[in-house]
Structures are given as structure tokens and as C-alpha cells.
């Protein structure tokens, strides 16, 4: 039976306005449960299991359970951080000091496609028992829930328990096998619900122990077609939401950008005018010095006098400015003349001495 249930009202106050609650006493947790959040613990490559997975026995009921209404709150996490794995299991002993988020996954979360919402790396294929992080080659929003004690209201109990962690899209109960399939709206919600409902029970105080796994792809063509349509609708809603967010931000950005560009252009024009004048002056000086060193003083003076007439000058200030530059250039040229005469004599004398010494050696 297909049923869509939205997330119920969890708390009257805003959840992120209060610090995250310490879920358990640190002294009550075993050493194996205090392993690091992601990829920093021992890993058995033969069984493809982490050391911390040793306590996750499907036959043992968990002593802890997350209560979103009371446990979630702000922590020391930044915007690029993942959700706390131990918070989803109800056994985080850090509370507001935790470096990860203590909240439900949001549709706006932009986690890496190669990782789950807890920051764990996905694998190419599912494990043989369909447990673990999941596959990076498939977006799976459906969970297999086993170990259920079938009751007349099992479907309602599943919806009640799983809707705390997201939007329940579909629930299908197999009465004769003691299992069910629960489809969440997004994969991140399914990842969180999988960890939160692992080794739990649908009714508080019951002896049942749920084991939650990833569901295999349904072989029914009608179910596959329905799942494909649901994924397309979800992608369409996501794109539509992103476009609406961009359209709301765009007018503000455009107005700010136009004002900024106008001010920058005004400043750039004034700076460019001054830079052009300085560059012209520097070019005149460099050309004068280079030409005077290569071709002689008189030729340079005549060249500057020929180029000294201002091209397309419009104001008297520019003419005065050019005249001052030419006078200063003439002074520099006169100084260079004396140096050039002195420097020309030294190489000449050196060459004579070198020639004389070489002749003596030949004799």
C-alpha cells in the first residue's frame, strides 16, 4: 500500500536554538563504541567489517535510541560537516561539543555522492547481506525491515516509527514472512533511518529486534516503472527548488553588481588616465636613454625635438606638462653625453692594451 506521510511536528521550539543534549553518560559506553566517526578505526579486510561493527548484533536489542524532539540541537559543526553517526544511534556522549551535526538530514544538504550523510565512503557494490553504507552506483531509498512481530496495525507502527526521521513514501508489509519494505523520500533520510532503527523495536518494551538492510531492486516491471517515475519527480522538485532559490537571490546580486561595476569603472577611468600619462612620460625617458646610448647625443636631441610636438593635445595644461618633460629630458641627455664620452675611451684603451699584449706574446 502506498502512503505518503510528512514529518510530524517534533518540538514546539526551534531545534537549532538549543544545544544538543548529551545522550548517554560517557562512563556507560564500552571502548569499542568510542571509536572515531569516520574511517579512523580498525578494519577487517577479510570480512569487510569495521571493528566497531562487532557490537551490532542483529539478535541483541540496542540499549539506546535517538529521540529527535529532545536530542537534536546545535553543535560545533560547520556547514561542510556530516551528521553524527552516534547521534542517529542515540549514544553520542559529546552533546553540544560534538564536531558533527545533531539533526536530521535536509533536502538542501549537498553531501558527496560517494559518501553517505555520515561521511562514510560507499562501495561499488552492496555487501552480501545488504548491510553497510550502500552502493555508489545506485540511489536507494528503500529499506528492508526484518524481525517484525506481525500485528494488525504493523503498517501504522512502521509509519509512526520511521516518519520521525523523514517523509515516508511507501510501506509494504509481507504478512507471512515477518518483514516489510519502507521507502523514504530521499536516500539521506533512508540512511539515517537505517541507523536509527537498527536493533530497535516498533513497540516500546517489546521483545522484537529489528534488523534493517538495504532493499534489492524490485523485479516487478510495474514497481520499477513507479520507482523511476518517483525518482524523476524528486529530481524535478529538487531542480525547481534550486531555481527558485537562485531567482530569489539574483535581483539582489544584479543590483549590487551593477553598482559595484559602475563605481569600479569610474575609478578605473581616472586611474587609467593617470597611468597613460605616466607611461608616456616613462616611455619618452627610456627611449631617450636607449637611443642616446646607441646612436649618439645629437641624433637623439633632434629626434626628441621632432617628436616634441604634442599630438592631438586639447588643453594648455597638457602642453605645459609636455614642455617640462622635454626640458628634463634635455638635461638628462647632457649628463649622459659626458658619461658616454668617458665610457667610450675606456673600451678603446682596453682594446689597444689587449692587442699590444697579444702581439708581444706572438713575437
UniProtKB/Swiss-Prot annotation:
Domain notes, please? The C-terminal RRM domain and the zinc finger motif are necessary for RNA-binding.
Query: A Gene Ontology molecular-function term?
Result: zinc ion binding
Any Pfam family hit = Torus
Under the cellular component aspect of Gene Ontology, which terms does the record hold?
Answer: post-mRNA release spliceosomal complex; Prp19 complex; U2-type catalytic step 1 spliceosome; U2-type catalytic step 2 spliceosome
- Which intervals of the chain are annotated as region Disordered? 246-325
Polar residues bias: start-end ranges? 290-317
Q: Does the keyword Metal-binding apply?
A: yes
Q: Which UniProt keywords apply?
A: Cell cycle, Metal-binding, mRNA processing, mRNA splicing, Nucleus, RNA-binding, Spliceosome, Zinc, Zinc-finger
Describe, by residue range, where the zinc fingers (C3H1-type) fall in the chain: 78-105
Q: Which PANTHER family match?
A: PRE-MRNA-SPLICING FACTOR CWC2, PRE-MRNA-SPLICING FACTOR RBM22
Q: What is this protein called?
A: Pre-mRNA-splicing factor CWC2
Q: Where in the cell is it found?
A: Nucleus
- Subunit: Associated with the spliceosome.
**Which intervals carry biased composition (Acidic residues)?**
265-286
Xref: Gene3D superfamilies: 3.30.70.330
Which GO annotations describe the biological process of this protein?
Answer: mRNA cis splicing, via spliceosome; positive regulation of cell cycle; positive regulation of RNA splicing; spliceosomal snRNP assembly
Domain RRM: residue ranges: 141-217
Family membership noted in the UniProt record = Belongs to the RRM CWC2 family.
Query: What does the UniProt function comment say about this protein?
Result: Involved in the first step of pre-mRNA splicing. Required for cell growth and cell cycle control. Plays a role in the levels of the U1, U4, U5 and U6 snRNAs and the maintenance of the U4/U6 snRNA complex. May provide the link between the 'nineteen complex' NTC spliceosome protein complex and the spliceosome through the U6 snRNA. Associates predominantly with U6 snRNAs in assembled active spliceosomes. Binds directly to the internal stem-loop (ISL) domain of the U6 snRNA and to the pre-mRNA intron near the 5' splice site during the activation and catalytic phases of the spliceosome cycle.
Q: Does the keyword Cell inner membrane apply?
A: no
Amino acid at each position: 500500500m502506498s502512503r505518503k506521510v510528512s514529518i510530524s511536528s517534533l518540538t514546539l521550539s526551534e531545534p537549532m536554538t538549543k544545544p544538543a543534549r548529551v545522550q548517554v553518560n560517557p562512563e556507560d559506553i564500552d571502548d569499542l563504541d568510542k571509536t572515531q566517526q569516520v574511517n579512523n578505526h580498525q578494519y577487517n579486510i577479510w570480512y569487510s567489517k569495521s571493528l566497531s561493527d562487532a557490537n551490532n548484533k542483529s539478535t541483541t536489542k540496542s540499549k539506546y535510541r535517538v529521540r529527535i524532539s529532545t536530542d537534536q540541537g546545535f553543535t560545533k559543526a560547520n556547514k561542510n560537516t556530516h551528521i553524527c553517526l552516534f547521534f542517529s544511534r542515540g549514544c553520542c556522549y559529546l552533546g553540544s561539543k560534538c564536531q558533527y551535526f545533531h539533526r536530521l538530514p535536509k533536502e538542501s544538504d549537498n553531501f558527496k555522492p560517494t559518501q553517505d550523510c555520515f561521511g562514510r565512503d560507499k562501495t561499488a557494490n552492496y555487501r552480501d547481506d545488504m548491510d553497510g553504507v550502500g552502493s555508489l552506483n545506485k540511489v536507494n531509498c528503500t529499506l528492508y525491515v526484518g524481525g517484525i512481530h506481525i500485528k494488525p496495525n504493523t503498517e501504522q507502527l512502521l509509519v509512526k516509527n520511521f516518519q520521525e526521521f523523514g517523509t515516508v513514501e511507501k510501506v509494504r508489509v509481507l504478512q507471512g514472512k515477518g518483514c516489510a519494505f519502507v521507502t523514504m523520500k530521499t536516500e539521506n533520510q533512508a540512511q539515517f533511518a537505517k541507523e536509527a532503527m537498527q536493533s530497535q523495536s516498533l513497540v516500546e518494551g517489546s521483545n522484537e529486534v529489528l534488523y534493517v538492510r538495504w532493499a534489492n531492486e524490485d523485479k516487478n516491471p510495474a514497481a520499477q516503472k513507479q520507482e523511476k517515475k518517483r525518482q524523476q519527480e524528486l529530481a524535478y522538485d529538487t531542480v525547481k527548488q534550486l531555481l527558485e532559490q537562485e531567482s530569489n537571490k539574483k535581483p539582489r546580486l544584479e543590483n549590487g553588481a551593477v553598482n559595484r561595476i559602475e563605481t569600479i569603472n569610474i575609478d578605473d577611468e581616472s586611474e587609467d588616465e593617470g597611468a597613460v600619462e605616466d607611461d608616456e612620460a616613462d616611455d619618452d625617458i627610456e627611449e631617450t636613454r636607449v637611443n642616446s646610448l646607441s646612436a649618439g647625443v645629437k641624433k637623439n636631441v633632434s629626434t626628441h625635438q621632432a617628436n616634441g610636438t604634442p599630438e592631438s593635445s586639447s588643453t594648455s595644461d597638457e602642453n605645459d606638462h609636455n614642455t617640462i618633460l622635454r626640458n628634463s629630458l634635455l638635461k638628462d641627455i647632457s649628463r649622459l653625453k659626458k658619461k658616454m664620452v668617458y665610457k667610450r675611451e675606456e673600451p678603446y684603451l682596453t682594446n689597444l692594451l689587449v692587442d699590444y699584449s697579444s702581439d708581444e706574446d706572438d713575437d
